[in-house]
Amino acid sequence: MISDIEFALSECNFQFAYKDLQKINLYIKRILLLNTRFNLISNSNSNFNSILNLHVIDSLLGLPTIKEANPSEILDVGSGAGFPGIILAIFDSSRKYYLLERSKKKSTFLKMIKLELDLENVKILEYEIEREKKKYEFITIRAFRSMNEYALVLKNLLKNEGLIMAYKGKFDRINLEVNQIKDLFSKIEVKSLSSKLSAERNLVLLYK
């Protein structure tokens, strides 16, 4: 299985250490083992290669943007099974990641994974986003919901000149969402990304 991870990362030109491969391998195995108990991902994608390509590789597509912005801390909203927060934290270990997940089941899983993978740069926040008072330079969210459902709430958690990075799907669905929230932000940028293994992905960057 580690060889599959190494191949996938190499195909997408991601830099990695062997310890990163070991952590990803264990992480995927834990999701497969505990998915039914914690309701982590769709059953239709609950096999090793689907998790690797649709979730792990997809999560990593945002890492270059994070490194370019170079924030000291990142808030990942609605972390669920840990995508993208856990994946980013594994490959970006010098940065602090706060994973906010309101579901007790999923946050329990995240706490288990944090300990098992020894992710000292991760902190799990188990509550509704409205309770969060800290301000962040950078926020990530990977959600199927329309951006107008969460844009204002997330903007209020940004420091001045902060940035929200929203993982979104097909480009033709994004324009309507962007038009609904364009007056909230000083600048909105759409980055079209692709890899040989993941589905179509666009990053929507919302600047305060």
Swiss-Prot record:
Entry GO CC: cytosol
GO-annotated molecular function: rRNA (guanine-N7-)-methyltransferase activity
Subcellular location: Cytoplasm
UniProt-listed InterPro entries: rRNA_ssu_MeTfrase_G (IPR003682), SAM-dependent_MTases_sf (IPR029063)
Keyword line: Cytoplasm, Methyltransferase, rRNA processing, S-adenosyl-L-methionine, Transferase
Keyword tRNA processing set for record: no
Binding-site positions, S-adenosyl-L-methionine: G78, F83, E101, R102, S103, I129, E130, R142
Membrane-crossing residue ranges in chain numbering: none
Predominant subcellular localization, coarse grouping: cytoplasm
EC number: 2.1.1.-
Protein origin, superkingdom: Bacteria
Record's keyword annotation contains S-adenosyl-L-methionine: yes
SUPFAM superfamilies: S-adenosyl-L-methionine-dependent methyltransferases
Family: Belongs to the methyltransferase superfamily. RNA methyltransferase RsmG family.
HAMAP family, sorted: 16SrRNA_methyltr_G
Function: Specifically methylates the N7 position of a guanine in 16S rRNA.
Protein name: Ribosomal RNA small subunit methyltransferase G
Species, as recorded: Borreliella afzelii (strain PKo)
